[in-house]
Amino acid sequence: MPTKKNNFEEQLNELEKIVTNLENGNVPLEDALKEFQEGVKISRDLDKKLTNAEQTVAKLIDSDGTEHNLDPNNASAPEE
């Protein structure tokens, strides 16, 4: 089970293991439900981490310290 201390890659690997187990279909129904629930939790946590990383990367800081957010629909042009 992943903990909050696990990094993105560790959680992604755990999610991939869960998906593989469920795809194989050799998991009893009760265990499959538990694994599915854990997979959903991990997926949501990974989504939050990706969103936070995206927001961090989307900020540009000019040489004078002024921050500009990138338009997510047009990553090449900062918003004014």
Curated annotation (Swiss-Prot):
Catalyzed reaction equations: Exonucleolytic cleavage in either 5'- to 3'- or 3'- to 5'-direction to yield nucleoside 5'-phosphates
GO biological process: DNA catabolic process
Region Disordered: start-end pairs: 60-80
GO molecular function, one term: exodeoxyribonuclease VII activity
Protein location: Cytoplasm
SUPFAM superfamilies: XseB-like
Biased composition (Polar residues): 71-80
Record-listed E.C. numbers: 3.1.11.6
Keyword Cytoplasm: yes
Ranges annotated as biased composition (Basic and acidic residues): 61-70
Alphabetic keyword roster: Cytoplasm, Exonuclease, Hydrolase, Nuclease
GO CC terms, sorted: cytosol; exodeoxyribonuclease VII complex
Reported function: Bidirectionally degrades single-stranded DNA into large acid-insoluble oligonucleotides, which are then degraded further into small acid-soluble oligonucleotides.
Oligomeric and partner information: Heterooligomer composed of large and small subunits.
Database matches in PANTHER family: EXODEOXYRIBONUCLEASE 7 SMALL SUBUNIT
Family listed: Belongs to the XseB family.
Protein name as catalogued: Exodeoxyribonuclease 7 small subunit
